[in-house]
Amino acid sequence: MASPVTVLENPIPKSGQHLLFFLTSKQQLALEQRPIESSLGYSAYVDHGVSQGVIVNPSSIAAAMRSSLVTVYGITKPGTDKQYISVISPTYNLIANRQNQPIETTQKALAACSDNDRNNWVYYLNLPQGTPQYAIYELNIQDSSSAPTVYSGPTPSGNSNLAAVYFSPNKDRFIIFSNTDTRHYLYWVNSTLQSANRISGTGSVMSASPLAATTITNVQTRSMTIFLYYMDVNTLLNRIVGKVTDNEIHWYANQVVEGAPPMKVDTLLTGVVVEGKWNCLYYIPDGDTEFRAFNDTIRDSFFDEPREG
């Protein structure tokens, strides 16, 4: 029986794509990004199956641009003890390795970043076989995913959340997490060097704090500014700013975000830069039940020199 089908032009400017939706042989929604110039090739949709069950909560979801399309990743659970990394929008599909096996995770953390072209990188936590220490895992997702890369150097806590950003001048990624210290400092790791580096001034971070990172890249100076937001032990929204050059980040002083409402203790956090002038943060304030927006205007005072603590 022929599949239902519909198509529209990708609204992203200059994408040069048609978005073709249809049903697979398993009667699940598929999406192919077909070039408007039909002589160009395309990648056929591969159906890895739908995870019967729910999107895990508490957990994390992460969105990134890939091939001019917004893709949302999540952790799904098919009613057993196993949890899988999945695409949950614009289609719903398990992510599989090259052996067509779904990618498992035991934890709630998930982050993603993009080169704004064909590559997404998805980060999650797992226990490497035979070890008691959680590690950061990286999936490079193009038209399909590769085998996970394990970052063996960093030692994230099992309840850590993750944030990830892409540095286009070096084609590097920076991943941020909380460590297994008695005080849960935040750390960063570079995808090339893979060694953990403590962020001074973040010793007040709440255990299992949500993390959000936004960026502004300066192509001329080959540098990038990272705005990292987290919850402290008093449930206040904190900000710390880092300047990326080459493989290093120079961090400035952490600050409580002025005027931001206290955070609900189990809220997650996300943010986006608006016109290079302010960061729009979304989180659930204490005593509320819905995500609210808070605008944090970028100021010179963000770049005070760092201090220990």
Swiss-Prot record:
Function field: May participate in wall plasticization and/or intussusception or in cell wall turnover.
Lineage: Eukaryota, Fungi, Dikarya, Ascomycota, Pezizomycotina
Residue positions the entry lists as glycosylated: N190, N295
Domain of life: Eukaryota
Enzyme class at the top of the EC tree: hydrolase
Membrane topology designation: Peripheral membrane protein
Effect of mutating A196G: In strain: IFM 45815, IFM 45816, IFM 46868, IFM 50992, IFM 50995 and RMSCC 2267 / CA1
Keyword Membrane included in the entry's annotation: yes
Cellular localisation: Secreted, Cell wall; Membrane
GO biological process: one example: proteolysis
A Gene Ontology cellular-component term: membrane
The protein's name in its UniProt record: Wall-associated proteinase
Annotated Gene3D superfamilies: Fucose-specific lectin (2.120.10.70)
Molecular-function annotations in GO: serine-type peptidase activity
The EC number(s) this enzyme carries: 3.4.21.-
UniProtKB keywords: Cell wall, Glycoprotein, Hydrolase, Membrane, Protease, Secreted, Serine protease, Signal
